């Protein structure tokens, strides 16, 4: 859950947790994949996530999550097919920072959104460190998760009534450029670098204290 506390000096955004709370999240991502500069394919990735708040301590929550990832490759498959199931357990604090074992493959993006320690209002911007994590087992035979840092830019765009709900609207953007460390010689092709751009609009339900969409 996300809590947005309105005050005269602005809004303080923070997560809050209730022991035993359970909820589901569904996300869909559209991406264009390029290999060696040439477009390989476009795909839609559907994530269905179940979350169990197993423990709460000092304002942080220990979240036990099950991820079901499905994919639809445009021009090849008309329907989504199940790609992978994952389980992850991690702590997340009031601002959104993760404490998680490095062996977990999910979630792919960590510490996003990360809220400022003080209050914010529409028009404010900030930046914060985050992390991407990728599963290269199937395509490249890399058994451990690949981690690399990203720098995320945030803009508090506005407050908006969306489907009857008063929301705080954030624009979240970052670019990736990561050279993959050389691995032992292999007969399989290995990635040299990973580049990309992520842009998302994030809506927080101010009254309910939850992510709206």
What do these predicted ranges mean?
Residues 1-213:
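Signature of exported/secreted
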